[in-house]
Curated annotation (Swiss-Prot):
Lineage: Bacteria, Pseudomonadati, Thermodesulfobacteriota, Desulfuromonadia, Desulfuromonadales
Molecular functions per Gene Ontology: sodium:proton antiporter activity
Membrane topology: Multi-pass membrane protein
Transmembrane segments: 21-41, 66-86, 102-122, 130-150, 160-180, 183-203, 206-226, 308-328, 341-361, 376-396, 410-430
Key words, A-Z: Antiport, Cell inner membrane, Cell membrane, Ion transport, Membrane, Sodium, Sodium transport, Transmembrane, Transmembrane helix, Transport
Chain's role: Na(+)/H(+) antiporter that extrudes sodium in exchange for external protons.
Pfam families for the chain: Na_H_antiport_1
Localization: Cell inner membrane
The protein, known as: Na(+)/H(+) antiporter NhaA 2
Domain of life: Bacteria
Major subcellular site: membrane
Family under the similarity heading: Belongs to the NhaA Na(+)/H(+) (TC 2.A.33) antiporter family.
Amino acid sequence: MPFRIAFLKQPFEDFFKHQASGGIVLLGATVLALVLANSPWSGQYFHFWEIKLTIGFDHFGLTQTLHHWINDGLMAVFFFLVGLELKREFMDGELASFRQAMLPIAAAFGGMLVPALIFHFINPMVPEAKGWGIPMATDIAFALGVLALLRGKISRSLAIFLTALAIVDDLGAVLVIALFYSGELAVGKLLVALVLLLILIAGNRLGVQSLNFYGLLGFCLWVVLLKSGLHASIAGVLIGMVIPARPRLCHEEFVDQTEKYMARYKEIGEVPGPFHHEERLGALLALEHICHDAMSSLQRMEHELHHWVIFGVIPIFALANAGLVLQLGNLVTAVTHPVTLGVALGLLLGKPLGILFFSWISVRVGLCALPRGTSWMDVFGVGILGGIGFTMSLFISNLAFMNIVMSNNAKLGIFIASMLAGAAGFTVLSRASARKAH
């Protein structure tokens, strides 16, 4: 029986370990949303996301539609993971030193600025102009999924460069949401949020490691920001940035305590039966506690949340937001609409041009150097993959447009650009690797 269960589990475990699997699940959720939106069950599909759900009590609770709970609540978990990744990268990653950080920062800045300018050039007037932030984003799950298909053909440094670029890109998108896509701000609630944030920072500086402390105050921060007019997703990033990055035990303490309890475990010896002797169990539990304390809260949470976000949060978001009614009679009109063109051209042209040009400038003036084993053709290919906006672009489009026609046109532009960018980026990087091989 155990063999049969293992036999059934193995294919799933292998799939979830593969780097491209997150993009595959996200693509599946998107296709399902499009199929449902254009099926006989279209009405039920859209109605389902408008069901109201109350969390709390009669006089102390939050009532939102299911769609809003996903965009404001569930996506806060995604942004929390973004905050954790940002902190790790700035402390001990590709963004830890000035010279290392300059290339992805410059590339991300160009990859945000040029698409926004292209969109604004095509849509200079309000209300269409409000969508300028949509083509600024990169979907890291899809982009890394395409790179994973080229495993063995591209350098590891190129994958690290794309990851760092996408993380900086996410930070830029968060700032854009906070500054330009939040509602009317309630100053009193923002002051309460600031006090909560300062308490969280103080807890971090004082060495508080309890995740209950950060979880409780973090939830309060999310609720206050939700009520303040500032988009609640910002709370996720802020909480992620204050999670402790240093473990309770240093390397020497971990080694000493591990050796101590391993020696005790060996002394007790093996006991008959499936259950451990009380002292032996105590040694095992102590080892478990030591291993827990040897890993920082930041790394542990990032590790534990990664799969839940990639295979749960983001696909659910896509399922709720990617539903687009495609009518053949209006398709030509929709494709040629300025919002559709602005989003599509911003992602398809603006992203690669901005990333390539700003990378070239930063290398040319001596601020940084290209990653080892990377050519300018590789950077151009990464720039094209940056045009896969998807998750964050869909998120911003929901904030930019209340008008359903404009929102749908923005989604159409995102879909067109993301598909073409994925195919073109794969082709360019494949040819670049083939040239190196020869």
